[in-house]
Structure formats: C-alpha cells, structure tokens
C-alpha cells in the first residue's frame, strides 16, 4: 500500500470516528482531505456518502438555527419590539455568514474535484444533485440578485443531473428518486411553483411504482423510503392546509441510501 493510499484509508477511518462522536465539522475536514488527495480518481460509494453525511449535518444544524431565529424575528416584528428585532437580525446575519461559508466550501470542492472526476452516471447525478442542493440552501436565505443567482445555479445543476438520471438510471434508483424529491422541493419552496413541484414528484413516484417489482432487495428499502417522502410532500402540497405550512416538507437524506428528512 502506498503512502497516499494509507493516508486516504486513515482519513476515511477518522471521518467514521468523527461521525460516531457527532463531530461533523471534523468529519468534513477528514473527507475533504480524501477528496483532495492527488490522483485519487473517483471516490468510492462509501467515501462520497461519508462526505455527504458530514456536510449535510454541518449545514443542517445551521439551517435549523436560521429557521428558528427567522420565526422569532417575525414574531417580535409583529409585536413591534424593535430593540429585540435589531439584535435578532444581527444574530441571523451571523448564522447566514456560516451558511454561506459551508455552501461555498462544498461547492468549490464539487467544481474543482468531485464533478470533473466523476465517470459513472450514478456518480455524476449524485454530485450534480449535491451541487443543486447547496445552491438551493443559499437561495433559502439570500435576497435580491444573490437569491436569483443561487436559484438559477440550482436549476442548472438539478437539470444537468436530471438529464443524466433520466437517460442512465432506473426509475427506482434511490439517487434518481432523491433528485426528483429535492428538485420538486426547489420548485415549491424557492420558485413558488406548486404545480411544477407536484407534477415532478408525481411523475417520479408513478414511474417508480410501475417498476417496483423489478427492484432488487438491496435498494428496495432505500427506494421505497424516498417514494414515501415524495408521497408525503404531494399530500401536503395538494391538501387544503398546504398554505398554512404546519408540516415539514421532506427532502432526501444526506445519503440517498439512507433515512430521514432534511
């Protein structure tokens, strides 16, 4: 084993250790080292999932914080507590700076290493979907021209991923389904296009249902779980109380072969 291979193996092990300890910032650091290793070629499925899990947890904590603070800000504004509102705005800006830094970090890594080195269709879709996801996270809190740019970048990345997925991945593939799920969330939440969101989610669900019998045992659980999330969103978006926003919109988990919501 070469020194580079040994270092790569050690960083992967340390990333798993950091995950067990729920030290996700360090998990990101270890997996970035793996991704940036010279002549590394494509990451293995395990490695790309570790990278995805690391970043999703780091960004997820800040996204949750931002939503909570934004909700409190709205309540205080409605009560006319201007002194509090100013402090909350300042605090929210701090969280937004952290969000921007995290998104910029993974987007640079995707553009410089991960997307260019991807050769298999599955890898290309995985990384382009990831690129779309992190541009979408920027669009969630940016305003004006920056929001418009983030939304446009999201659309380009998701469409590029979709083109490859439709051509090369089965309708029941967890990564293809996860892409459809997150792309539909983008249409609903960022572009305010509920009809497009529902059409995309319904088509992905219906196409997968038609091929469910041909699904191998290996990905059956992963695929059906994402299909359930697609159906949950469709139910929420088409119900009378969709506008009330009481329920959480579901997104693909940090790794398509995994569990959970955003």
Curated annotation (Swiss-Prot):
Q: What is this protein called?
A: 14-3-3-like protein A
- InterPro entries in the record, alphabetically? 14-3-3, 14-3-3_CS, 14-3-3_dom_sf, 14-3-3_domain
- Biased amino acid composition, Basic and acidic residues: 247-262
Q: Which SMART domains match?
A: 14_3_3
Instruction: Output the Pfam families linked to this UniProt entry.
Output: 14-3-3
Q: Which organism is it from?
A: Hordeum vulgare
Read off the PROSITE patterns from this record.
Answer: 1433_1, 1433_2
Question: What does the sequence similarity comment in the record state about its family?
Answer: Belongs to the 14-3-3 family.
Annotated region described as Disordered, given as residue ranges = 240-262
Q: What induces it?
A: In response to penetration attempts of powdery mildew fungi.
